[in-house]
């Protein structure tokens, strides 16, 4: 389990593609780099991945099954990704905890500003929307958010403008795709 609180933003430095697998090399901020080693399990844009290699400040992950079910298939060199290292045993997680099991990809429908908040309207795939209600939590690119409202297949989340600096949420625009982790039918992550 993860807290759903982004610890830093990495930048895609290299993508190697094979038939069924991609290896992503991500430049890590120093403060997070010091807490990872080979076999560390962590979230990259909300998706649980395992470190396979570290060279300098570049951390490598193999992406296989997640290529077709996440935004990894569209990432390019230079893109920013949210990073979170799994908390230690016994850490408090809070009610917005994430598993790293991405349920689908959603599309940003609209973004508006209100004082110090950004309101992001996200079009959720039909197979996921039926299990979502306002005031639930949802993971968007690894950031745990409360849902303010649900209207048809559109949800609205709010986040403070400072999160647009400390996460990759600031790069979102209408049409952007995001990884989504939702509650399942039994209301568990």
From Swiss-Prot:
Query: Keywords of this protein's UniProt record, alphabetized?
Result: Luminescence, Repeat
Q: InterPro entries, per this entry? A: ATP_synth_asu-like_sf, Lumazine-bd, Lumazine-bd_dom, Riboflavin_synthase-like_b-brl
- What PROSITE patterns does the annotation carry? LUMAZINE_BIND (PS51177)
Name the GO terms of the biological process aspect: bioluminescence; riboflavin biosynthetic process
Cofactor: record remark:
Binds 1 6,7-dimethyl-8-(1'-D-ribityl)lumazine non-covalently.
Q: Which GO terms describe its molecular function?
A: riboflavin synthase activity
CDD domains according to UniProt: LumP (cd16256)
Q: Which cofactor does it need?
A: 6,7-dimethyl-8-(1-D-ribityl)lumazine
Repeat positions for Lumazine-binding:
1-96, 97-189
Say which domain of life the source belongs to.
Bacteria
What is the purpose of this protein? Antenna protein that modulates the color of the bioluminescence emission of the luciferase. In the presence of LumP, luciferase emission is shifted to higher energy values (shorter wavelength).
This protein's name:
Lumazine protein
The scientific name of the source species is Photobacterium phosphoreum
Q: Which gene encodes it?
A: luxL
């Amino acid at each position: 389990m993860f807290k759903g609180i982004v610890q830093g933003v990495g930048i895609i430095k290299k993508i190697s593609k094979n038939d069924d697998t991609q290896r992503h090399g991500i430049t890590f901020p120093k403060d997070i780099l010091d807490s990872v080693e080979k076999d560390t399990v962590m979230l990259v844009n909300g998706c649980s991945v395992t470190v396979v290699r570290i060279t300098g400040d570049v951390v490598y992950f193999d992406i296989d099954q997640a290529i077709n079910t996440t935004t990894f298939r569209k990432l390019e060199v230079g893109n920013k990704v949210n990073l979170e290292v799994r908390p230690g045993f016994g850490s408090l997680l809070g009610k917005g905890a994430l598993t790293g099991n991405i349920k689908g990809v959603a599309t940003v429908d609209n973004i508006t500003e209100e004082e110090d908040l950004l309101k992001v309207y996200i079009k959720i795939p039909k197979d996921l929307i039926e299990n979502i209600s306002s005031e639930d939590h949802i993971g968007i690119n690894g950031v745990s958010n409360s849902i303010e409202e649900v209207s048809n297949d559109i949800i609205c989340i709010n986040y403070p403008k400072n999160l647009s600096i400390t996460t990759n949420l600031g790069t979102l625009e209408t049409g952007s795709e995001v990884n989504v982790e939702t509650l399942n039918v039994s209301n568990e992550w």
